[in-house]
Amino acid sequence: MNATRKAARLRVLFATPECAPWAKTGGLGDVSASLPAALAALGLDVCVLLPGYPSVRQAARNARKVADIRSAHGLPSARLLRGRLPSGVPALVLDCPSLYRREGGPYQDGEGVDYTDNALRFGLLSHVAARLASAASPLVWRADILHCNDWPTALAPAYLKLGLPGAAPSLIVVHNLAFQGIFPLDVAERLGLPPESLKSEGVEYWGKLSFLKAGLYYADRIVAVSPTYAREIRTEAHGCGMQGLLETRANRLAGILNGIDMDAWNPRTDPHLDTNYDADTLEDKAPNKRALQAELGLAADDDALLLGMVTRLTDQKGIDLVLDALPELLARPVQLALLGGGDARFEQAWRQRAAARPDRIAAVIGFDERLAHRIEAGADAFVMPSRFEPCGLNQMYSQRYGTPPIVRATGGLVDSVGDFSVDGLHRGEASGFLFAEATPAALVEAVDRALKVFADRVAWRTLCCNGMARDFSWGGSAGRYARLYVAMRAAAAA
């Protein structure tokens, strides 16, 4: 019996702090919607657990109560409600109004300030996730595998290892190692963590409590969201202080590249585009460029290389590299269309640059799903100069839309973009342009490489088609997770 058929017998609890479209702040929300659906398509019995934020309660308003969760330690009582995501995957909503019913986002209030009780909010989520994967499950349904995501669920493996009976094996997926869920150590008592766990061989991290470290230390397996990122986080440059622990657990660490929703991101059917197209009708991409230029007030110029960016405006994303490179870029036949929000200093800088050269630079501050799709289709190339990028999704969307990405060689960008070479172009491997150094000069050099190929319309079309031929669907990644679940289950039974 192959691994996928064995996995079809497994019950998997997918614990997450966000899941699109019910609650989303970034890529984790998309992954939490798509991966469980792909696992269910393989025959696994998957259930998603997430907090009952107001948006979740509204979306799951027909959910029915299936269990009461009694207060434990310093954690409040709650209810479990059962509903279904739009994909049809079952969802358990953790309803606790005192912790989750707030007007802000999942992690911060409306002013962008972290909630002061986040340790309790996500401690409860982790504790309930662990119970559902143990003999203490409040439901008849009990998970064979607990799949945790980032720091908000990372305390669950610790609960499983520190006393819950009949604990199932767990894995923690690292979507971004920089977010570590660090709190004062004295909150551990309210979370019900035993004294023996409050040490460096446990949840303690430089005199504080780290949810993420707890997951990395106690989980049976660790997954990073790309093979390259799995290697990078074991180094001082990218380990965010956790590289020593990750090195000791290297034999339990794997990298599995995220996928994308190939239906939602499909230029042939995308309702947001002026003209739909595919690899066979790539000439129909051009009207989308003209429409984007008109919408954003850019000069109508078929010959300019229109660079698109849809990004958070943060240091991690290398936004300063693009700003510093602008004088050189504007000396070339280049236009830029940016959509994003984040650090106020970057927002202001982009507003100023766009106001100074509105024919060449357009900056829309904030996020607009429709415009994001239109930039992917209307841009000639897509820029992602990230200092680090665990996986990244926009470079996959770009290739899907025949928009070659210009990316820094880090993390998932390395694993999903084929660097241009003449041989690679004709072998079908080249799909974009990579640069190594996080400097404005390296970015400009990569844009120059793109301009040279852009001038050769036949080569450029081949490059676009190479990207469009790539399979970024979740099927392959889901299969790798399924095989990992089978291995975890077998190891636990040995």
Curated annotation (Swiss-Prot):
Keywords from the UniProt entry: Glycogen biosynthesis, Glycosyltransferase, Transferase
Catalytic activity: [(1->4)-alpha-D-glucosyl](n) + ADP-alpha-D-glucose = [(1->4)-alpha-D-glucosyl](n+1) + ADP + H(+)
Transmembrane region(s): none
Keyword ATP-binding included in the entry's annotation: no
Gene3D superfamilies: Glycogen Phosphorylase B
Binding residues for ADP-alpha-D-glucose: K24
Top-level division of the source organism's lineage: Bacteria
EC number(s) reported in the record: 2.4.1.21
Enzyme class of the recorded protein, top EC level: transferase
Family annotation (InterPro entries): Glyco_trans_1, GS/SS, Starch_synth_cat_dom
GO BP annotations listed: glycogen biosynthetic process
Pathway, per record: Glycan biosynthesis; glycogen biosynthesis
Gene Ontology MF, one: alpha-1,4-glucan glucosyltransferase (ADP-glucose donor) activity
Family statement drawn from the similarity comment of this UniProt entry: Belongs to the glycosyltransferase 1 family. Bacterial/plant glycogen synthase subfamily.
Protein name in the entry: Glycogen synthase
Taxonomy of the source species: Bacteria, Pseudomonadati, Pseudomonadota, Betaproteobacteria, Rhodocyclales
Name of the encoding gene: glgA
